[in-house]
């Protein structure tokens, strides 16, 4: 991990990190097509893929989409330099793949939120510095409406992290326990009870970018134009000529249609 942090810093110093991230946050402010060319040139060289995957896909992208200006200025340059590694606090022991069934709670107490609950199957939590956490903030509305996203350091008082050893000996996954963990409201991502909106975009970034050989390529999709349709993003990046690019665009469109249908059902109280 230390070596990958070093490689990420070398990329940053050489102007090769955050190619599509706005210059105001330490990036180069270029296009996905520029990053695609860089990815091809980097083939065969040492990379920081292990730390980039959870950090930049999708955490950095979510910060670009929904972070406040102060949050972006504070964290994105540090991410690009390899000084901050991020993870996702999403899955829970009792929720399976239904993220909207999150039972980890966040209760407001003045300018802070108090988190209690647990998360599981988090990749790389043992070496990360910060995380995005989906928590339940309102039990009196349909489940998709009562969620909020927070960012928090992994070493806050009240947080316990345990590595999970798989049958093959792999220990990359972790589980975490939150006991009266206090998070400032300033570290909330997006509006209160609108976490599902954030999460939908969050999952879009993760799914679109998961199979990229160098996850730094699509990190700046938001910077390349917030609401840009996936088809246009893929075309600008030169990915419409490969099967993976077309598959991802098709899957993204399908997810958009499903999300729209679910949104209508939730609004109708179904």
Predicted regions and their residues:
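A short core secondary-structure module
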Residues: 116-162
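Glycine-rich phosphate/pyrophosphate-binding beta-alpha loops
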Residues: 95-96, 120-126, 167-168
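A short, Trp-centered hydrophobic/proline-enriched beta-strand micro-motif
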Residues: 82-90, 134
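Short Ser/Thr-interspersed hydrophobic loop/turn segments at strand-loop and sheet-helix junctions
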Residues: 15, 38-43, 135, 151-157, ...
């Amino acid at each position: 991990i230390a070596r990958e942090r070093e490689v990420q810093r070398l990329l940053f110093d050489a102007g090769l990190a955050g190619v599509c991230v706005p210059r105001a946050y330490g990036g180069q402010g270029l296009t996905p097509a520029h990053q695609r060319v860089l990815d091809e040139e980097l083939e065969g060289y040492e990379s920081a893929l292990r730390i980039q995957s959870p950090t930049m896909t999708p955490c950095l992208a979510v910060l670009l989409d929904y972070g406040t200006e102060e949050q972006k200025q504070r964290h994105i340059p540090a991410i690009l330099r390899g000084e901050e590694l991020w993870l996702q606090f999403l899955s829970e022991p009792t929720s399976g793949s239904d993220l909207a069934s999150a039972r980890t709670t966040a209760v407001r107490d003045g300018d802070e939120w108090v988190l209690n609950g647990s998360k599981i199957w988090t990749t790389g939590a043992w070496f990360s510095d910060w995380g995005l956490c989906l928590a339940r903030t309102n039990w009196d509305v349909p489940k998709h409406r009562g969620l909020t996203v927070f960012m928090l350091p992994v070493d806050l008082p009240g947080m316990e992290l345990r590595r999970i050893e798989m049958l093959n000996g792999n220990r990359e996954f972790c589980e975490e326990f939150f006991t009266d963990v206090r998070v400032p409201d300033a570290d909330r991502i997006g509006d209160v009870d609108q976490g599902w909106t954030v999460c939908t975009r969050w999952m879009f970034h993760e799914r679109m970018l998961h199979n990229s050989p160098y996850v730094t390529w699509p990190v700046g999709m938001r910077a390349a134009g917030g609401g840009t349709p996936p088809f246009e993003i893929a075309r600008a990046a030169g990915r419409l000529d490969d099967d993976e690019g077309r598959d991802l665009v098709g899957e993204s469109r399908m997810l958009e249609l499903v999300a729209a249908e679910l949104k209508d059902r939730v609004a109708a109280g179904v």
